Amino acid sequence: VPIFAVPTTAGTAAEVTINYVITDAEKNRKMVCVDVHDIPVVAFVDPDMMSSMPKGLTAATGMDALTHAIEGYITKGAWELSDMFHLKAIEIISRALRGAVENTPEGREEMALGQYIAGMGFSNVGLGIVHSMAHPLGALYDTPHGVANAIILPTVMEYNAPATGEKYRDIAKAMGVKGTDDMTQDEYRKAAVDAVKRLASDVGIPADLKEIV
């Protein structure tokens, strides 16, 4: 059956991926399914369809999209084409999410594009342990998926840092951090993590799991 998708949030990129999630409420489980028949034949990505999202949902889905982009950029399967998608998505989402939370037309439009580009990237290379941990958190505690991602992401970035080469310099630069070319490895890695924390804080995401479980 052909699928025509009309996304109403800017985060999951379900309209351009072959992944979907089934929640088993009785067993408190979330199951990630992959099916090539799940991908839509046409996606109508219209930011006006997302304008009714409340601030909290906008923030959560936006941080989900940023997590897609960052995890996709540093995953083992990353390569030149996926890197192009993910870096551009990081750049767009980082500058647009604050405005989208305030429901500005420009922020909504850019978030619609940024999350879509992130989906184009990660659907080709996969994600990482942030999503692996966020799914059971959501299943067990009913934590919004994007909120769980946003809280876990900085810690996982710190853990993964030794295996990422100079990619955190690229992430920091894409997120608007100045002077990254003159930073040491430790400095630009910290700058990338701090930029993620700052964005999450600015859009009202809790800083710690203790606040949500």
Task: State the predicted function of each range.
Residues V1-N19:
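Proline/glycine-rich low-complexity loops and linkers
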Residues T8-G11, M49, P154-M157:
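Acidic, glycine-rich active-site loops and adjacent beta-strand->loop/helix elements
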Residues G11, Y116-N149:
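Glycine-rich phosphate/pyrophosphate-binding beta-alpha loops
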Residues V16-V125:
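Carboxylate- and glycine-rich phosphate/diphosphate-binding segment that chelates Mg2+/Mn2+
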Residues M63, I90, V130, N149-A150, ...:
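A general structural signal for well-ordered alpha-helical segments in protein cores
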Residues Y73-W79, V125-L127, Y159-E166, A207:
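Short helix-capping/linker segments at secondary-structure and domain boundaries
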Residues L140-V213:
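Gly/Pro-rich interdomain helix-loop hinge
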